[in-house]
């Protein structure tokens, strides 16, 4: 196979993955929530169809925490660490609250409220062979913090492909760890994020670990998932 055919095949596979991945909806009481964090594949599909540019793309940098918040050149949802990702089903990061809101609207959804997000993450509302129905747990993984992409549990030391992480409460994936997730709850110019990220320990994945961040903020640690009425 020539180098040109390999390039064509690679581009075809990328296009196929952009179109092929569908994020399942899980019914939680009177609303639905996506099983996975919104992926690079999904966000790219939205951006391609709407000619959408994130602020990280416009500014030419994303943020990582070092000696304070440090700019990282060419870090955006397409190249989260400044280079092509290992997988297009990694979470879409470097996305602000407002940009996440626009994506969810595009797919006829919205950001979940913190109350909705918390119910989905900690209370087992569906029949399950693993978790007790109607019980509210401490962690998105159950009574104990385990198998979540947090700095003290898994050795990835970065966000990870959502299809390779285990299911937790209600069959949802990465409600604890991996990346913080925007919710629609607001306070002045800030919005509430939940679930913590891989950079933190698992203790931050509890309900009390939620944090407000500036709504126009974007960084390597922050992504989202959408909720739906039906």
Residue ranges of model-derived segments:
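Short, compositionally biased
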Residues: 2-80, 97-98, 123-127, 218-230
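Functional-site microenvironments in short loops/helix caps that host divalent-cation chemistry
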Residues: 53, 64-65, 71-211, 220
